[in-house]
């Protein structure tokens, strides 16, 4: 055998081997494919059965839900049907009742028609009888029916007038007695329900010190400290033998309070000299102004009054440092406000409005300007200026009869003002006249041009007038003091003599840096 034959057999062997491998591989692949397909069919069948079960469960669930809904709707329909049947029965019963009532009404109508015919017949007979009797009476009395009627009316009229007059007089007397009793009851109840302290305002303040050594420091060298404090505060300081006490005298409570607080701060600080005194007095004056505003706010809050203008609140706070015939003005105004509210409630009026008018009724006593205008009219102008209601303004202006009373609140304010001021010990006219005289002294001096401040001290026996250095000169100072003295002699009544001191001070301040 040659090489060719070997190669041929080798090739045929390879072909046969490859064919056998291919057949075996094909058989294996076919078997594997059939296994995979069988497994897939089994899994598909399982999934199919699972899905069928899920669908069946959902179907059964939906079927159950639908059956429940159908049952509920059937129940509702049955309920509605039963209600409709009940309503139908009710309507049928009502229809029967209406039919029955209609039959009864027809029967009553027939009876009324018969009765009306009988009444008409009787009326005709009565008219005929009346005519016959009237003619018979006229023939007997000799008077016609009209004349007899007129005489009867006149007789009845006179009798009615007499009875009415007696009845009216009786009602008037009873009303007077009732009104008098009711008025007394209201006033007594109002006074009983307002309990206030009675305290007479003085024109001096006692400043207590720890030791008499401080007196010398307050007086200063040759009295310069005490003079500086008197000039800055506008009050008289009395240092005598009274142990541990200094008396601050002045008719203006604001000035006395400023001097007291300034002294307190100076003594605590220890530095007492004219420059420090002026600085402290200026600082304390601002503090007192803030305290005045705070007092006004507390007062209106305590009384439950809202919506007041800030300037009115400031004036109310300033009442704390004003007095009327020795009676503290703020206490008097609060008392009057409470009395007005109680009395207005008893009379069926607005208590809040009455309380507001009572608080503001003496607001015209607070400002220092326009002294020639009565305080009631000045108070009314202030209320009008700060947009208070017309009946409030009228009550303030009319409580001393300067203007006509236009509302029911005005007489209440007038009465309550009188009640508050008429209590035993509430007022002291001598002090009021004294304070008015000192105030008139200061206002007289303030009327001159160039005057900055005026202070009446030593119970009105000395008037200190401070003028601006830029508006006057030394030559005019003496002329001014003489003019003021002459006017005081001509226009005012005063005991003893009044010393007029005009102070003109020029200062030049520089700072070294």
UniProtKB/Swiss-Prot annotation:
SMART domains per the UniProt record, alphabetical: HDc, KH
Compartments reported by the entry: Cell membrane
EC number of the protein: 3.1.-.-
PROSITE patterns associated with the record: HD, KH_TYPE_1
GO CC term (a single one): plasma membrane
Transmembrane segments: 3-23
UniProt region (Disordered), positions on chain: 77-96
InterPro entries, per database record: HD/PDEase_dom, HD_domain, HDIG_dom, KH_dom, KH_dom_type_1, KH_dom_type_1_sf, Ribonuclease_Y, RNase_Y_N
One Gene Ontology MF term: RNA endonuclease activity
General function of this protein: Endoribonuclease that initiates mRNA decay.
Entry similarity comment: Belongs to the RNase Y family.
Stated name of the protein: Ribonuclease Y
Gene expressing this chain: rny
């Amino acid at each position: 055998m040659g090489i060719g034959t070997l190669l041929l057999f080798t090739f045929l062997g390879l072909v046969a081997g490859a064919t056998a491998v291919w057949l075996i591989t094909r058989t294996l692949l076919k078997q594997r494919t059939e296994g995979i397909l069988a497994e897939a069919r089994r899994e598909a069948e399982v999934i199919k059965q699972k899905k069928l079960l899920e669908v069946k469960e959902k179907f059964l669930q939906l079927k159950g839900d639908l059956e429940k809904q159908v049952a509920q709707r059937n129940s509702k329909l049955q309920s509605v049907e039963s209600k409709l049947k009940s309503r139908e029965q009710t309507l049928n019963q009502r229809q029967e009742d209406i039919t029955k009532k209609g039959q009864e009404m027809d029967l009553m109508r027939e009876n009324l028609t018969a009765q009306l015919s009988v009444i008409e017949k009787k009326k005709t007979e009565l008219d005929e009888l009346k005519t016959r009797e009237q003619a018979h009476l006229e023939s007997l009395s000799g008077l016609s029916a009209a004349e007899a009627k007129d005489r009867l009316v006149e007789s009845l009229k006179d009798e009615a007038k007499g009875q009415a007059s007696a009845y009216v007089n009786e009602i008037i007397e009873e009303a007077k007695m009732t009104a008098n009793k009711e008025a007394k009851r209201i006033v007594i109840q109002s006074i009983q329900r307002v309990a206030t302290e009675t305290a007479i305002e003085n024109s001096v303040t006692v400043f207590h010190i720890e030791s008499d050594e401080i007196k010398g420091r307050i007086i200063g060298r040759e009295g310069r400290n005490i003079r500086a404090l008197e000039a800055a505060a506008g009050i008289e300081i009395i240092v005598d033998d009274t142990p541990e006490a200094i008396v601050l005298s002045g008719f203006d409570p604001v000035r006395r309070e400023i001097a007291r607080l300034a002294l307190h701060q100076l003594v605590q600080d220890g530095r007492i000299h004219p420059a420090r005194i002026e600085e402290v007095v200026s600082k304390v004056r601002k503090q007192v102004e803030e305290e005045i505003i705070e007092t006004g706010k507390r007062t209106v809050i305590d009384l439950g009054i809202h919506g007041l203008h800030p300037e009115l609140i400031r004036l109310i706070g300033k009442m704390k440092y004003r007095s009327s015939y020795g009676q503290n003005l703020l206490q008097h105004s609060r008392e009057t406000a409470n009395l007005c509210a109680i009395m207005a409630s008893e009379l069926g009026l607005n208590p809040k409005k009455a309380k507001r008018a009572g608080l503001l009724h003496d607001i015209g006593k607070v400002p220092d300007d326009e002294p020639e205008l009565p305080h009631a009219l000045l108070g009314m102008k202030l209320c009008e200026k700060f947009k208070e209601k017309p009946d409030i303004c009228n009550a303030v202006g009319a409580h001393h009869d300067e203007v006509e009373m236009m509302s029911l609140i005005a007489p209440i304010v007038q009465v309550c003002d009188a009640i508050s001021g008429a209590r035993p010990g509430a007022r002291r006219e001598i002090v009021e006249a004294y304070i008015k005289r000192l105030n008139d002294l200061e206002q007289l001096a303030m009327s001159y041009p160039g005057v900055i401040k005026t202070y009446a001290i030593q119970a009105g026996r000395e008037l200190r007038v401070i003028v601006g250095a830029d508006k006057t000169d030394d030559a005019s100072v003496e002329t001014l003091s003489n003019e003021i003295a002459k006017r005081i002699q001509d226009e005012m009544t005063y005991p003893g003599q009044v010393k007029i001191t005009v102070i003109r001070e020029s200062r030049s301040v520089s700072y070294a840096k």
